[in-house]
């Protein structure tokens, strides 16, 4: 596989083979293959990234390399290279990503790893409501812009995180008790966020940690108290109107056991109901904050849990915030192989690069140690791919 990648990198554009499934096939500045293999179609994800997806063969005309006026373009769909992301794409997936934020951008050891190993980034905090709109109609984008600019300049896909969440929510939103006011506030916040980054975001976590309590019922929050279930449709429809090309997700934690109420009577049942009602939900994000093998939600439960989520009517699923207490090589392999085995699973994002920067520092849950050296789990994934 490495030899093939080198040969493709050295070949002239005219000699490039057709792009494989999930491979890049166009976008502003793209100079690689612009047709897809048989049985695939070239679909626009955003202005800079077109991707080969299952469907009728052939391709539509793509932007030439002169379009875009020098605008940075993500090349995360390129299957060349030897990092985790490139190897994962070679197995038919869209990305292997990580979480960063603006305060990581001057950390050279961390950023060098991101550039070499990961093809997608999620912003840890700077896109959350308290950071973006601390007071009504007063938006602050500077820190989120830094992450988006880094990603586009370095060819990384972006997951927008997050539009609605009951935590990190300004007090002025929590104090709203009027249905029409809260509806207008949600619509304005979502429209403003999604419009600003239109064409740059692959996936949005439209609703995050917000939907379900552990028994599968709606979580108590200002959104559910004032609007009931309706806040879901309000948020998703506003996001779809603002950027029809972005994939829209419900993202939640503790979706790691196939028979757990939060998975069955919570996520799967409600997503099916909402999709049937016309709410534009594209995907389910399972965060994957996992325990060690003896804990409540070990990695061993993930394969069956992913299959249960994939049995829903959502078009795709993703593992969005993966970290595992102890970072056992076997546990990471279990999760990666579970995603590889489920066609709807489009990608994995680990929740940070190094244990030094993890929100769970005592658990040492990531692929790199506190000195930014690869751990056994990283080596196991790289070797398995």
UniProtKB/Swiss-Prot annotation:
Database matches in Gene3D superfamilies: Glycosidases
The UniProt record lists the keyword Nucleotidyltransferase: no
Enzymatic class: hydrolase
Keyword flag Lipid metabolism: no
SUPFAM superfamilies cross-referenced by the UniProt entry: (Trans)glycosidases (SSF51445), Cellulose-binding domain (SSF57180)
Ranges for domain CBM1: 23-53
Family to which this protein belongs: Belongs to the glycosyl hydrolase 10 (cellulase F) family.
Catalytic residue list: 210, 321
Sequence segments annotated as region (Disordered): 56-84
This protein's GO CC annotations: extracellular region
Superkingdom classification of source: Eukaryota
GO MF, any single term: cellulase activity
Protein name: Putative endoglucanase type F
Signal peptide: 1-19
Any Gene Ontology biological process: cellulose catabolic process
Keywords per UniProt: Carbohydrate metabolism, Cellulose degradation, Glycosidase, Hydrolase, Polysaccharide degradation, Signal
Biased composition, class Gly residues, residue ranges: 67-83
Species whose genome carries this gene: Fusarium oxysporum
Catalytic activity: Endohydrolysis of (1->4)-beta-D-glucosidic linkages in cellulose, lichenin and cereal beta-D-glucans
Enzyme Commission number(s) of this protein: 3.2.1.4
Segments forming domain GH10: 105-384
Region feature Linker, mapped onto this chain: 53-84
């Amino acid at each position: 596989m490495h030899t093939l990648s080198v040969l493709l990198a050295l070949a002239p554009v005219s000699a490039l083979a057709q792009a494989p499934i999930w491979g890049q096939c166009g976008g502003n500045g793209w100079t690689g293959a612009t047709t897809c293999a048989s049985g695939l179609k070239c679909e626009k994800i955003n202005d800079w990234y077109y991707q080969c997806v299952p469907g009728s063969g052939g391709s539509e005309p793509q932007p030439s390399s002169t379009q875009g006026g020098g605008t940075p373009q993500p090349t995360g769909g390129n299957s060349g290279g030897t990092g985790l992301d490139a190897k994962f794409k070679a197995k038919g997936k869209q990305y292997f990503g990580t979480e960063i934020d603006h305060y990581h951008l001057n950390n050279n050891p961390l950023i060098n790893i991101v550039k070499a190993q990961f093809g997608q980034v999620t912003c840890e905090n700077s896109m959350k409501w308290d950071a973006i709109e601390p007071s009504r109609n007063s938006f602050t984008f500077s820190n989120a812009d830094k992450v988006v600019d880094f990603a586009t300049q370095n060819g990384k896909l972006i997951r927008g995180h997050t539009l609605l969440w009951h935590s990190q929510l300004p007090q002025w939103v929590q104090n709203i008790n009027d249905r029409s006011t809260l509806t207008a506030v949600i619509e304005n916040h979502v429209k403003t966020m999604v419009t600003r980054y239109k064409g740059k975001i692959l996936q949005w976590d439209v609703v995050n940690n917000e939907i379900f309590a552990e028994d599968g019922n709606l979580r108590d929050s200002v959104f559910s108290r004032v609007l009931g279930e309706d806040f879901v449709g309000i948020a998703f429809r506003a996001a779809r109107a603002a950027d029809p090309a972005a994939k829209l997700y419900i993202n939640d934690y503790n979706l790691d056991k196939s028979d757990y109420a939060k998975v069955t009577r919570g996520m799967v049942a409600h997503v099916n109901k909402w999709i049937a009602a016309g709410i534009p939900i594209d995907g389910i994000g399972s965060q994957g904050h996992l325990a060690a093998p003896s804990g409540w939600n070990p990695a061993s439960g993930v394969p069956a849990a992913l299959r249960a989520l994939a049995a829903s009517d959502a078009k795709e699923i993703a593992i969005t915030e993966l970290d595992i207490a102890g970072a056992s090589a076997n546990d990471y392999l279990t999760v990666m192989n579970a995603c590889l085995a489920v066609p709807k699973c489009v990608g994995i994002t680990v929740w940070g690069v190094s244990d030094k920067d993890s929100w769970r520092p005592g658990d040492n849950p990531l692929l790199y140690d506190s000195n930014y050296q690869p751990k056994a789990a990283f080596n196991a994934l790289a070797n398995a791919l």
